[in-house]
C-alpha cells in the first residue's frame, strides 16, 4: 500500500484529525455502530456502575453506556473524535451522565479503582503500548470490575488468544474470547474478549 494511502487512512481512522478525521468519524459511527451496541449489551451495565470507554470514536457506544450506567467516561486522543462525541452525547453530557477527556488506554487520567467496567471497540490495534494500556485499565478498574474488548479480527495486532494471554499477563482473570459476526454483508468478523480484575 502506498505511503499516501496509508497517511490518508491514518488521518481518517487510525489517528483521526482534520477534515478526514471528521469524515472517518461519520463512517465509524455507521460501520461500528452495531458492534458498539453489542459490546454495551455484553457488558450488562447496571444503573449504579461507572464505565470507561477507551477510544469512543464518534460516541455511539459511549452515549448508550451513559444512558445505561450512572456515568460513562470517554477518553480519546483525537480532538476531532472528542468534538463528535460532544455533539452526539450533548444531552448525556448536560445531564452529567457522560464526561469526555483527552486521553488514551495508556493514559486515562482516572483514579485507581474508580470504574466498574471498561469498554474498547476497534482501537486496541492503535494503542502505542498494549502492555501499558492493559496495566492502566487494570489499575482504574475496581476489584471484580470487568473489561469487554472488541476489534476487527483481521486487524488485531496478534491473534485473539495471544491478546487474551497478554491480558492474563497484565493481571486480568476469567478470560473469555469468541468471535461475533456483526450484521451486514460487508461487516468484518469481530474478535471479542471479556476479563475481570481480581477481587
List where the protein language model places each region.
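N-terminal, positively charged/glycine-rich alpha-helical extensions of SAM-dependent methyltransferases
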Residues: 1-20
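Conserved alpha-helix/loop element of class I SAM-dependent methyltransferases that forms part
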Residues: 29-49
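Class I SAM-dependent methyltransferase SAM/SAH-binding core
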Residues: 50-107
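A short SAM/SAH-binding and catalytic strip from SAM-dependent methyltransferases
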Residues: 117-129, 153
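Conserved beta-strand signature within the Rossmann-like core of class I S-adenosyl-L-methionine
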Residues: 144-151
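Core SAM-dependent methyltransferase catalytic element
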Residues: 183-199
Amino acid at each position: 500500500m502506498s505511503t499516501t494511502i496509508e497517511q490518508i487512512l491514518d488521518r481518517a481512522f487510525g489517528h483521526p484529525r482534520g477534515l478526514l478525521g471528521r469524515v472517518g468519524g461519520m463512517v465509524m459511527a455507521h460501520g461500528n455502530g452495531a458492534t458498539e451496541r453489542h459490546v454495551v449489551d455484553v457488558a450488562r451495565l447496571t444503573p449504579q456502575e461507572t464505565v470507561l470507554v477507551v477510544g469512543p470514536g464518534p460516541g455511539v457506544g459511549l452515549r448508550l453506556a451513559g444512558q445505561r450506567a450512572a456515568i460513562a467516561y470517554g477518553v480519546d486522543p483525537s480532538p476531532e473524535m472528542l468534538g463528535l462525541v460532544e455533539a452526539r452525547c450533548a444531552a448525556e453530557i448536560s445531564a452529567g451522565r457522560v464526561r469526555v477527556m483527552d486521553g488514551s488506554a495508556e493514559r486515562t487520567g482516572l483514579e485507581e479503582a474508580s470504574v466498574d467496567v471498561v469498554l474498547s471497540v476497534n482501537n486496541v490495534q492503535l494503542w502505542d503500548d498494549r502492555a501499558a494500556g492493559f496495566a492502566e485499565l487494570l489499575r482504574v478498574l475496581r476489584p471484580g470490575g470487568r473489561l469487554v474488548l472488541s476489534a476487527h479480527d483481521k486487524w488485531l495486532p496478534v491473534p485473539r488468544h495471544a491478546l487474551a494471554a497478554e491480558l492474563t499477563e497484565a493481571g486480568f482473570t476469567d478470560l473469555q474470547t469468541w468471535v461475533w459476526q456483526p450484521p451486514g454483508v460487508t461487516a468484518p468478523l469481530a474478535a471479542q474478549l471479556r476479563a475481570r480484575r481480581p477481587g
